[in-house]
């Protein structure tokens, strides 16, 4: 008996079928001689073939189909026809004895199963060539899809891909298309990162090669003051004055005093004055002396072509007593008045000085008011006429007490003097002198020949006017008054 190969079967299937069928009669003929050996060999033969087929394709669909055919289940078209023919063959030989029928049924069933398994494998290879991907095991396709999911989740965050039940062709196409779809998105991310610009918020964060923006250039205009010589509060005040400008006359006066002027068209421009101090409106308090550091103006042009002394603000030239350092505003009044008087220099300058002197003298005692006309009529270092009698000299006050002489010398300058009658019996006359430590009374001694001298080592004079005339040009020979001369005579109210 020889099996005819099916139309879809390959050459290998025909060879296997012919081999099995040609071997069957020989084995059946020898069944009488060694039935036990043949039965054992036929039982092991299909099992070996099954093991080889399952090892070649573990868990494949062919194994399941062979198992179904053994259990009597449905299978594919060619397998089903072969199974039915095998069943008919077995039923036709039912009349054989029990031993022979058992041998023939087992041997034929094993051969049919082996031939059917290989035939179905080859027929699937030829007939189902376009759908090869569908025959892949579910475990393998799940493994491929899992790899694709991990790749897409890490790179793109997308998980909407086909499940394990999808075909391998769609999974392979998605796997092949995923790198190409990820490519443009990665490129877009790189382009976005390249287009990002660094925003610099502060000037301290700038590297040395950073380009400055327009906002930074606007913030660093000329109006900003970043000097290190002045305190922070002074910088803020100066910046505010430069921006808004100040119409306060006191501030302009201080500008005249502190800043050099630039002459233009024969005059001064108030716009060119450097604003170094703030107004009282901005501060809420008067400007202080030490608001700005000492900056001497060297050779700078001043108003009316006069230069201010560069060391006028030095501490050693400060005329204030130690107790007045806490009251700078009162002391600065005279300085502000001098600053305001810069524009009035010329013919009005002498009258301004006289007014200052008169104002100073008004604040003194009533004795100064009495002596004020006498002081204004005589200049410093007035010459004495030695030929004029003593009674006609303006500095002779006659018989006045010691206390009265001191009171008359009190408002006078240092080295002021007067001559009076002495209260002591040793001399007739005495000279009252104003020194830095108070009033000194010098006794004029009279010799036996009616001449006058101050001490035993000094010169001798014939009259008191000659003594006064001599010591108005020479220094007095007394301890504590070696550097003094009789400079400022105090006129008597009788003359």
From Swiss-Prot:
SUPFAM superfamilies, per database record: SH2 domain
Annotated keywords: Phosphoprotein, SH2 domain
SH2 domain segment(s): 395-490
Protein origin, superkingdom: Eukaryota
Biased composition (Low complexity): 162-181
Comp. bias intervals (Polar residues): 135-144
Basic and acidic residues: compositionally biased ranges: 148-157, 208-224, 301-327
Region (Disordered): 51-190, 203-233, 256-327
GO molecular function, one term: phosphotyrosine residue binding
Residues recorded as bearing Phosphoserine in the entry: 107
Cited Pfam families: SH2 (PF00017)
Protein name, as recorded: SH2 domain-containing adapter protein E
Organism ancestry: Eukaryota, Metazoa, Chordata, Craniata, Vertebrata
Gene name in the database record: SHE
